[in-house]
Amino acid sequence: MRKETGLKLTAGQLLARGVCRHLLSYDYVSLLEFIPKTGRRVDVIGLGPKGEIWIVECKSSVVDFQSDHKWQDYLEWCDRYFWAVDKNFPIELLPSESGLIIADPYDAEIIHMPQEERLNSSRRK
């Protein structure tokens, strides 16, 4: 019998894992639980091959989404902002101007690509 080892991942962490795997297909490098200068922690930040910065917030439930009051603070720290949710999440609750990623623990798919809002160059340093 094989003994289970390691940490149990939360539902949000499993979504983040699928998102990171998908971003790799775009040649993006991902960091989990990154803290920009604001001091607030983002779930996933993706760094693209041309210097693009994407932030992805992973929401595992409606309650998780509704209790997130910090997400708008992230908009000025990225070129594109996304929500990542599972296939059962009621996507009509999400702001339409944000990007949408449907994810699972193994992969993800970008459903809606948000308009690019180029990050101020002084913030890229």
Predicted features along the sequence, with ranges:
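N-terminal short leaders/motifs
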Residues: 1-4, 51-59
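Non-catalytic C-terminal interaction segments of nucleic acid-processing enzymes
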Residues: 1-35, 93-125
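Active-site beta-strand-loop-beta-strand hairpin of nuclease catalytic cores
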Residues: 38, 42-55
